[in-house]
């Protein structure tokens, strides 16, 4: 048995945005592969998507911009990072449009309130049918199709920004990187 004492020192850089992207992707895959709980998996995917873009622009801003304001709104941060490298922000067109929608979705849930929605309609037929329940805007947004589109657009936006800033590592596929030194103590 080796009783030597070893000291390990170094630095680990954890790419939070990469974890959030993986979480959004995993939740979407779960929604696609199983009807059971798919609404909740879509919800998680879209929320993680919104968290991811904010984490990514924080990553870029803190690394590349000297006067970064981490307390600005996520969309203001996105605009600032994009402007620095000549990327046009058009919230009326994909893929940027999806960043706005996902952020609005996230805000609806993060600052959620109990909603009261009016119900009034007439229908012919059997009275045993289920009542058509009205849905909030965030509930209407929470679909597999939307979650998939937002994730595709998120990836496109991040890759575009990443390429323009010429980072040394890929935007995706790496969750963390670092270096370590192991020293055997005598």
Model-inferred region functions:
Residues 1-42, 178-186:
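Charged alpha-helical initiation segments
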Residues 7-15, 32-47, 93-96, 100, ...:
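Short, solvent-exposed segments of well-ordered alpha helices
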Residues 15-23, 76-80, 98, 153, ...:
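Exposed alpha-helical structural elements
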Residues 22, 43-80:
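Short, contiguous, well-structured surface segments enriched in hydrophobic/aromatic residues
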Residues 24, 45, 49-56, 102, ...:
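Amphipathic alpha-helices that form helix-helix packing interfaces
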Residues 29-36, 61, 65, 114:
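Short, flexible helix-adjacent loops and helix caps
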Residues 83-92:
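Acidic/His metal-coordination segments adjacent to aromatic residues that form catalytic metal sites
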Residues 93-101, 105-174, 183-186:
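Charge-enriched, short contiguous segments at helix-coil
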């Amino acid at each position: 048995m080796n009783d030597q004492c070893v000291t390990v020192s170094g630095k680990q850089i954890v790419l939070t945005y990469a974890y959030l992207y993986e979480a959004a992707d995993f939740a979407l895959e779960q929604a696609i592969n199983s009807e059971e709980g798919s609404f909740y998996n879509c919800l998680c995917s879209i929320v993680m998507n919104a968290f991811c873009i904010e984490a990514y622009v924080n990553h870029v801003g803190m690394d590349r911009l000297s006067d970064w304001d981490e307390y600005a709104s996520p969309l203001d941060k996105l605009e600032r990072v994009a402007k620095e490298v000549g990327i046009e922000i058009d919230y009326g067109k994909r893929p940027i449009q999806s960043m706005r929608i996902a952020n609005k979705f996230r805000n609806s849930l993060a600052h959620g309130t109990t909603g009261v929605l009016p119900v009034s309609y007439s229908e012919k037929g059997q009275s045993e049918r289920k009542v058509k329940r009205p849905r909030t805007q965030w509930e209407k947004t929470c679909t597999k199709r939307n979650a998939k589109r937002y994730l595709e657009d998120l990836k496109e936006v991040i890759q575009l920004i990443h390429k323009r800033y010429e980072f040394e590592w890929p935007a995706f596929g790496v969750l963390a990187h670092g270096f370590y030194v192991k020293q055997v103590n005598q």
